[in-house]
Design a protein with these regions (language model features):
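Extracellular glycan-modifying ectodomains
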Residues: 1-220
Length: 220
């Protein structure tokens, strides 16, 4: 059925069933398949990737490039009505270009995420990001590329929790009271480890240790 596009402050797109999507940075043009990369730009990007791979190879580092699909590529059914000019879009083309013209490892887990959404909500309704379950599925694709033992998402326990206000609510200057039913998950895939506290940059564990994510060039 026809659902007209409605954009708030040039940045937030209202979708079906109250879903929100990011409208900035040419996201809508990408969704419609319009902003295809030229051969010259693809060649330039690949050249930079090869340069980085060469540096990593000399240091004995295994390099993996991973592209995370935009939310609208996974939850297209909640998007407003748009005419799709090309279903073979820029990321699909670029991933194929890299694979056909180099030995660089590149991961684009769009099929894995589309399969996972049959069982869980894997992106936030009111935020641009994937949730913990989406990230878990994506990481398994990375593990596969690195030959690290994988965990089938269907075999893990996941506790559903409420998600607080998403970034799209703030970007669109929307009333948060109308967008308060989002979903996240606490994924329990290593029962021997219990999370005692999660304070942003440090997660306490019951064995006395802690998990600290690295950000940018910060050493850990």
């Amino acid at each position: 059925s026809y659902f007209p596009p409605n954009i708030f402050y040039d940045r937030v797109l209202e979708g079906r069933l109250n879903w929100l999507f990011y409208a900035g940075d040419n996201n809508i043009a990408y969704y419609k398949g319009e902003n295809i990369l030229s051969d010259e730009i693809q060649k330039t990007y690949l050249s930079l990737m090869k340069e980085l791979k060469s540096i990593c190879d000399k240091k004995g580092i295994q390099l993996q490039f991973m592209i995370i699909p935009n939310k609208e590529q996974i939850y297209w059914e909640y998007m407003p009505t748009y005419s799709i000019s090309n279903t073979y879009k820029r990321v699909d083309r670029f991933v194929d270009y890299v694979k056909e013209n180099s030995d660089i490892n590149i991961i684009y887990p769009i099929n894995e995420l589309k399969a996972a959404k049959k069982y869980w909500q894997i992106y936030y309704k009111y935020d641009t990001h994937w949730n913990n379950m989406g990230a878990f599925v994506g990481v398994q694709s990375l593990y596969k590329a690195l030959d690290i033992p994988m965990t089938n998402p269907l075999n893990v326990e996941a506790e559903e929790v409420k998600k607080q206000e998403g970034d799209l609510v703030s970007l669109g200057n929307l009333d948060p009271n109308n967008y308060c039913d989002d979903i996240n998950y606490n994924v329990i895939y290593k029962p021997e480890i219990h999370i005692l506290q999660n304070r942003g940059d440090k997660i306490g564990r019951d064995d006395g240790g802690c998990l600290r994510p690295c950000r940018g060039s910060r050493s850990c």
